[in-house]
Amino acid sequence: MSDNYKPRSLIEIVNDVLSTVRDYYDSEYVYYIEKEQDDIETIYEWCAENVPWQRDRLKMLPSENQPKWMKQEITDTTSDSYSVFQQLDEDTTAVLAAVGVHRGGCEIALMRAVLPYIPQAIALQKMQKQQEYLSYHDDLTGLLNRNSFVDYLDHVKEKELKSLGALSIDINGLKN
């Protein structure tokens, strides 16, 4: 990898994917939603210019008021909304939806092709954050560990310190 390469955040990646889907279908909105039964756990939204965000409103809707595209797949390309589903686990379903489509007759193959990668990116980011957390915290207690202390010492300005202390406790067999 070059020195100029900087990994992009999950938000940037998902926004790029949703923006591409929105442009392809010329829709007002594109959503990626993870729902457990009828409760929305995760929601990402991308909308056309000068179109108000609806993410928070959608998240608060009771299940009986949720739009049709959120409850069932809509693959009829003459409809004004398309949605595809993917079962992530026993209770969780991923939904990718283009809402307010202006260019009808498009194949939904793009949505079917893209959908599996979004939850994968989300899962990878969660695992990365967990690894980062565990590199500076004890897994059993959640307390800061030696790596955290060493990192702190690398970044602290000695001239600004008035005092510094560290407590280290090693109890044999605690983790066994």
Q: What are the language-model segments listed below?
A:
Residues 19, 113-116, 151:
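Generic recognition of well-ordered alpha-helical segments
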Residues 135, 154-165, 169:
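Nucleotide second-messenger and two-component phosphorelay signaling modules
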Residues 103-123:
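Amphipathic alpha-helical "output/dimerization" segments
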Residues 3-47:
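Helix-loop-beta substructure at the N-terminus of cytosolic sensory domains
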